[in-house]
């Protein structure tokens, strides 16, 4: 059987990717890789250095020289050049900037390199927007999560409220709609389901229901020999 089993979870902002991916990784004893945090770290650094978001070449050069470390402990800390940016990268300003930076090919090239290195460490659950289509095209299970735009905005708004960020639900909805547009229309690795991905609409579902469904799908593949036959 393939040693480094891979589960790819893609979907738009607010679909529940990170929460669900972390729960699955915990239950399976796999590594969890939040690729969105990597892009956020680059966006945060660009903002901190006052690099205009339109300066693609300068941002790409900066990304090539940036070290991003994801802590695989329960705390899930994110480090950018040794600095703990776990909370800082979740700001509304970073959220509004990240899709612009993520569309730059050389930035994606650098971060995909780091993401594939992470996947080589062992069994992994990785979430993002192009995991099943580009980062891990041979993943053993590919899931594409979605939910209604209103549901996703509400979830993100509640998340920001818990973090002490005072934004209205309408502002969060506008930011999310703009990000959806950027992600779906970008020329490099647009947000689309992989041809062999399983689509799950999480609207109105509890986290436990979604996690159980994905674990069942994964276990079915393992038990029926799918993983073994596809990855010898």
Swiss-Prot record:
SUPFAM superfamilies in UniProt: P-loop containing nucleoside triphosphate hydrolases (SSF52540)
Listed EC numbers: 2.7.4.25
Pfam families: Cytidylate_kin (PF02224)
One GO cellular component term noted in the UniProt record for this chain: cytosol
Main location: cytoplasm
Entry's Gene Ontology BP terms: nucleobase-containing small molecule interconversion; pyrimidine nucleotide metabolic process
GO molecular function list: ATP binding; CMP kinase activity; dCMP kinase activity
NCBIfam families: cmk (TIGR00017)
Membership in a protein family: Belongs to the cytidylate kinase family. Type 1 subfamily.
Stated name of the protein: Cytidylate kinase
Species whose genome carries this gene: Desulfitobacterium hafniense (strain Y51)
């Amino acid at each position: 059987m393939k040693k480094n089993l891979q589960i790819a979870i893609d979907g738009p902002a607010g679909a529940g990717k990170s929460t669900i991916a972390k729960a699955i990784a915990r239950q399976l004893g796999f590594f969890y890789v939040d690729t969105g945090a990597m892009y956020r770290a680059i966006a945060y650094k660009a903002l901190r250095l006052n690099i205009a978001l339109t300066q693609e070449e300068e941002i790409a050069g900066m990304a090539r020289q940036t070290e991003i470390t994801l802590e695989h402990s329960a705390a899930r800390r994110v480090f950018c050049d040794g600095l703990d940016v776990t909370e800082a990268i979740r700001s509304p300003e970073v959220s509004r900037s990240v899709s612009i930076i993520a569309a730059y090919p050389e930035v994606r090239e650098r971060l995909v390199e780091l993401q594939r290195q992470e996947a080589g460490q062992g069994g992994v659950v990785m979430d993002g927007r192009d995991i099943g289509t580009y980062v891990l095209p041979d993943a053993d299970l590919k899931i594409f999560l979605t939910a209604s735009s209103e549901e996703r905005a509400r979830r993100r708004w509640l998340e920001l409220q818990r973090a002490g960020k005072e934004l209205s639900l309408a502002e969060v909805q506008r930011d999310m709609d703009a990000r959806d547009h950027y992600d779906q229309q970008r020329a490099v690795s647009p947000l689309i389901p992989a041809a062999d991905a399983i689509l799950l609409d999480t609207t109105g579902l509890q986290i436990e229901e979604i996690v159980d469904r994905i674990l069942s799908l994964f276990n079915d593949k393992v038990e029926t020999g799918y993983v073994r036959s596809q990855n010898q």
